[in-house]
Amino acid sequence: MEAALSRKTAKKKRKTHTTRGYRKREQEVQKLIRATEGRISGPEHDMEALSLQFFHGFEGEMQQENDFAVEDCQESDEDSGGELAEEPTDSPSQTFIHIDLHDPPLAWGQLFKQRHYYDESLLYRPSNTLHFQLHLSDLSELKDSQIRMLNRYQEQSKSKSGKLGSDLIGQLSGQKPASFLMGKHLYRSVCHRRFQSVFFPPMPPSELKGLPSRRCLKLCLKQLRFSLHPQLLEEHRLAQQLEDLFDVYSQQRKQRICRKLREELEIARQVALKLLASAGQDQTAEVKRQLKLTRQLRQRYYAESAAQRNLLQRLLKEWAKLKELRRQQRFQCTRFQLGLRVVHPPDLEASYCAWKESFETDLAEVYREHLELFYTRLRLWTDQKSHSRTATGHSKPPRKPQFDRIMASLRKEYDKTFKDPEEPYVEVFRLHADEATARLSIPGGDQLPKARNYFLKIFLDGQFVGQSRTYRLEPDLQISINECIGVLLERSLPENLNIWLYEKSTLTPKSRRLAQISTPLVLSSKDDAVQEKLSFQALSSTQLAGDVYLYYEYRSTEGWGSALHLDDVQRLPDALRQTLLPQSLPALPQASKELVTPRPPSGRIKKSQLPSLIFAEQQLQFCGLDVLLDNRRFQLLHSRHQQRNLHTKQLRFVPALEQEISEEEPLPDGRGTVQLLEPGTYWNPIDLHKHRGRKFLQLLYEVIASQSARRAKALQTPLPLLLLAEDSDRSSGTGWTALWRAFCSVFQGQRNSLPREPSGWSGHQSAPDLFKSFCVSLHVVRATGVPVRSRHILNLNERRSSAGGDMSTSLFVTQTLMYSNVRPFVTLSYGQRLCRSRTAEGSNPTWNEQLQLQIQSQFGDLRDDLKISLFDELIEQQYSDEASDVYQRVQCNWLGEFRVPINSLLASRTFEGCIELAMPKVLVGYKRPLIDSVTNMPTDQYPEFKEAVHLWFYLSIEPGGGDLAPLHSCALACAEKPELQQYLDERRLELQQLLPQPQRYVEPLVCTAQGKRVCLTRLMDPVPLPPAAVPSGENPLEICIRYVSLLSHLRSYDPCQGFRGVWLDNQSLLDSTWCSVKDLGVLLCNYMLSLGLECWLILGVSCPHGECSFVLFRQPETAELFLVSPATGKRYQLQDVHCPLRRIYCVVGKQNIYFNIQTETRVSMTHFNLQDGACWFPLFRRRVPAPQSGVQKLDYAYKRSYELSQLQKHIERKIMKKISAWRTTRKTIWNRAFQPRLHKILCDMEDLSTFSRGRYDEPIFSEQLEREFPNYRLYGFTLNFAYTNLAAISERIRTSCIHYNHDASVEFCVAVHLHAHANDVLSVWLFLLSMVPLVE
C-alpha cells in the first residue's frame, strides 16, 4: 500500500526543465570550481562540504546580522522609499531554486510575447582594485578574488559603521611571512606632531591596567519623584500624569518634527515637479520613486500633526480635570501649574487663503495618486481580459475614483489633523511658582503626615563616590535635588551606576535603605550629555515607587571639547600577529659549561650579577606600613587630625619620644571608625543624660508647636461678627450671652488694655529668627547690706576689747569706721560684653546711675543670662625702692550677682523693684555687716542691716519680644467632656467682667506632654517622693524643696514655657531633668500633697522669671502660710516686701481654681482668704466639681545616679585649665596645701543649704581660715548651682573675675564637691581661693 502511494506521488511530481543557456552557464560554474580546487590553501575541501557551506553555512550568521541590523536599516529604508523594507532578507540557500535538468521547462505563454530591453549600464561589474589602503609587504601578489572579497567586506563594515576586522584581513591576505633580521641600530625619525608626555610610575606587571588617562564624569541629580507613596492622593497621580504629558509636549515642540516634515514635503514636491517636466522614457522609475517618497512624507506629516494635536487636547483635558479636583477637595498639595497663550489670527482672510491653498494642493496630489492607481488597474484588467482564454467568467472593470468622495475624505482627515482657520493658536507653558508665593495646603485631620527626609548615595561599580544632601519631602511628593557630583576617573571606566535611596529618621541618627536604582553607563567623549529617567521600587514594600531624573557627561580633564579624540586601538589577534611578524631566528648553540682547557680558579670567568630592582617609593620609606600604624605617637597625631576622639581633640602637644607618652587611657584603633557619641567611653554618662534630656524637651516643644500650628491652620474659619470684643475668645461667639456682650461692646466701646498674650487665631507674624540689635538699660539706684572687708573689722574688735568701753554711745562713729572700707560698683554683662557703674563707698551705697548694654544677636541665640554683678574695688599702695615712686594697683573682688534669663526679659520687657542678690555661702576676706556683731541692740530697730544684700533697680530691653508667635494650644484636642468645656466658657465670660486687668486670666485647659488639653486641677496629684525625702527621713519638706530647686531650667525664647504652653508631668520632668519654671511649682506642690500638707499652686509673675509658679503651704505647727519659690528653694512670709513674686493671677488647688479679682496688685497687701467671694472667684461649683488625676504617674521609680569621682576630676581639671588659659600674661601657681581644708568646708555646705532656711553662717569658716593661715592675704568664695555641663561652670567662674589678680606672688586653689541626688540631679559646690603671701 505504501509503495503504491509512493508511486502515485512520484507520478504526480512535476519536474522543472531547464533551458540550453542555463545548462551552459551551469557547466561553466562547475568547471571554474574544479579549476580553483588546487588553489585553496590549507586542508582540502570536497565538493559536498562546499555545497553544505553554500546552502547552510550562512543561515546562522545571517540571522544574527539581521537581528542587529533591523533597527539600523529600518529608518534608512523608509527614507529611500520603503522598497528595501519590503524585500525579505533571506540566506542564499533560501533563494536557490532546485532545477532538474531532465524535465522539460514549463514557460508562461505571455513570457514570450513581451518585449524585453537590456541596459548594459545596470549590470554590476566588481572592480579588481582595492578601495582602501592596506599595509602589506606586496599588494601585487593578491588575487582578484581576494581583492573583491576584501572590497565586499569593507563595504559591509561601512554600512554598520564599523571597521574591517584584522583577523579577517589575516585570513584573506594569504601572504607569506616576511623574512628579515632584527638590527641593533636605532634611527631617529622626524615627526611634526608633538605628543603629550605621560608619567608612568613603575609597578609590577600584574597591577598594570593601562596607560593613565584622567577623565571627569559629571553626574547631575535633578529631581526625585514618587509615583507610589503612603501619602499619595488622587491629585498627585493626576499631576504626575499631566507633568509627563507636558514633558512629551515640550519635547515635540523643541524638536519641531511637523515643521521639518513640512519643509521636506515641499522640497520633495518641487523635485517631483521638475522630474515630471523633464522626464524621459529612461527616468520613469525615478519619477515613480520620487512620487512615492512624496506620498510617504505627506502621510507621515499628517500622522505627526494629528498626534501633536491629540496630545494638546489630552493635555488640556487633564489640566481641566486637575483644576476641578482641586476645587472640589478645597485644598492643593501639588505645585504643578500650566498657563495658556492664546493668539487669534490677525487676518482671517489670509488664514483662509493659506488653508485653502494647502488643501487644494493636497487634494490635487491625492486625486492624481488615485487616478494613477485607477489607470494601472484598468490596464492590468484589459491585458488580463485580452489574454484570458480559459476563463469562463469576466471580472468587473475598476471604477473611476469619485472626486467628491476623495475631497470629503481628505476634509475629514484635515479636520482631525490641522486646526480650523478661525481657531486661535494655543500654546501651553508651565508656571514655575516661587517657594515664597507657593500656596500649598494639606487636608485637615487628626493624624497629619509626618515629615520625611530622603537622600541618595552614588556608587560606581560598587564603589561609593558621593552622597547628596538630605531633603525633606514636599507635599507634592517631589524633591528638587539639583546637585552635581564630579568623579575623576583614571585608567578604567565604570560600567554600572548604582543609586541607593535612603530615608533619614527625624528622631534618631540612623537611616533606612529603601530602594536600589541600577543602570549601565554609556560613556563616550564624542557624545553629548546623556539624560535618563530611572524608575525604582522599594525592596520591602510595593507601596513605594518613583523616578529619578539625572544626566551625566564624560569629558577630558584638559578642557571641555578642546581635547582631540583618539581612535580606538584594536588589539591584533594572535594568528595575525604570527603571520605579520617575522619568525624568531634560530638560537645560537649553547657553549659548554666546562672549558676545553682547564684553567686555574683565578682565570675563570665571573658572571656579572645585576642589582635587584627597588622602586623609588620603597627607598623613601622610613619604616614598614605595619610598624607605622602600630606607633603610638602616629595614632595620637592621626586621632587629633580626625577630630573625632574627645580625648585627643584638644591636644596641643604630642611628645616626640614614644616612652614619654603615658598609657593611662587606651587609644581607639586609628584604622577603624570611632563614633562621636558613645555613652560611657568618650562622654561622661551624666553629661550624656543631660544632653539627651535637653534635646528631648526641645524636640517635644517643636513637635507640639508644629502640631498646634497645623491644627489651627486647618481649623481656621472666618470669625463671626458677634466677636467684637478685642479680648474675647473664639468659643464665646455662640449663645445669647455672646449676643448681649456684642451689643454692650458696641455702645460702651472697647477697653484700652492690651491682652497678656496674643489670641490663638492671630494672623501670621514676622519670623522670630531675624537679626536684631537689642539695647538693655539698667537703672541702678542703691543697695543695702554690702559685705565689708573683714580685716578692718577684726582690728576694730581688738581695739574695742582692749578699750573695754561701751560703743553703743557712739554708734554713728562706729558705723562710719566699720562700713566705709568697701568701694562697691555694679556691672551689667551678657556673654563677652560688659558695662559698669561708678564706684560708691560704704555698705549701703547709692549710685542712681543708668547703664546701657548693646546686644547684637538672633532670637535663637539668646540663651544666656544677663548678669548684674556686685564688685568691690580694692586699691593697694605699691612702693618701689625709691621713696618718690609710689603707684597704685586696682583689684576687683566679686561679691555676688543676680541673673536674669534673657527670654524672661524679652517676654516681660521690664523688671523693677527690689531684688536680693545671690551671695556666696562663704566669702573669705569679707564679713556681713550685722548689727549684733558690734552692739547688743536688737536687730528689729535697724531694718537696713539684714543678712541679704538688696538692690533697687529698673531693667528694660528694647525692642521687646513682640515678634514671638504664640502657641495655638486652643486648636489641640481636649480630653475633657464637651459639657465641661461649655461650662468653662460660660464661667470665663462671667470672670472677665470681674477681672480688674484682663492679663490675670489664665486658661484652665492646658496642654500636657501628650499633646492634649486637660484641666489644671488634674495636675495636682500626690506623686512618689525622692529617695532621700521618705517620711522616715529628717525634715523631708526641706529635702524636697532642695531637690526641686536643683532641676535644670531650659533657657530659650519659646512660647511653650508660658502658661499657654506645655505642662510636663512628673515622668517627663524627672526622666529628662529639664523643665520650665512653671513645672517646678507643680512638682513641689505634688510633693507637699504626698507629705500630707495643705498647699496650693500660685500662678503669677515674678522677678526675674516672668510667668512662673509659686507654692503656698500652711505650716502644721504654727498654721502660718508661707510662699516658696521652687526655682531657688527660698521661703517667704506673706507680708515680706522682698518676695520676688510681683503679681498673682490665680490659685490652683486640688478641688478648685480661684482667680484673683482684687484691685490690689502688691503681693504683701493681698488677702489670702480663698472663701471670700469679694477677693477670689471660684471657677468650679458644687454641682460641677473639678476633674482630678489622670496626668501624673503615681508609681514612678527613681533611678540611681552614676559614679561622680571621674566627673569631679574632670571639673577640677577644667577649672584649672581655664584659669591658666585666661591668665595668658601671668604665670599661674596652684597651691594644693589649702585643698584638704576647702574640701572639708564644702562637705558641710549641702546640709547647711538644705536645713538652714536661708541663714548665712560663713563667718565661722572664713574666720577659721584667716586664723589658720595668718601669713596670707586670702580672698575666695563658694559657688553652688545645679550641674548642666562643663561650659556652664566655666562661664560662672569667668564672670567672677577671680583670675584678674595681677599680683606677682598670687597663688590659687580650687576644690570641687558634688552631691548626688536621684536621677542624676547634682549639686555642684566650688571653692575658689586666691592667696598672696604677706611680706614681713
Curated annotation (Swiss-Prot):
Composition bias type Acidic residues, residue spans: 70-89
Compositionally biased intervals (Basic residues): 8-23
Keywords: Cell projection, Cilium biogenesis/degradation, Coiled coil, Cytoplasm, Cytoskeleton
Domain C2 residue range list: 755-915
InterPro entries: C2_dom (IPR000008), C2_domain_sf (IPR035892), CC2D2AN-C2 (IPR028928), CEP76_C (IPR056288), CEPT76/DRC7_peptidase-like_dom (IPR056290), Tectonic-like_complex_comp (IPR052434)
GO biological process: cilium assembly; non-motile cilium assembly; protein localization to ciliary transition zone
Coiled-coil regions listed in the entry: 136-156
Record's subcellular location: Cytoplasm, Cytoskeleton, Cilium basal body; Cytoplasm, Cytoskeleton, Microtubule organizing center, Centrosome, Centriole
A GO cellular component annotation in the UniProt record: ciliary transition zone
Principal location class: cytoplasm
Tissue specificity note: Expressed in the antennae of chordotonal neurons and male germ cells (at protein level).
Gene3D superfamilies: C2 domain
Residue ranges, annotated region (Disordered): 1-29, 70-97
Subunit structure comment from the entry: Probable component of the tectonic-like complex (also named MKS complex), composed of B9d1, B9d2, Cc2d2a, Mks1 and tctn.
Main function: Probable component of the tectonic-like complex (also named MKS complex), a complex localized at the transition zone of primary cilia. Required for ciliary structure and function.
Listed name of the protein: Coiled-coil and C2 domain-containing protein 2A
Protein's organism: Drosophila melanogaster (Fruit fly)
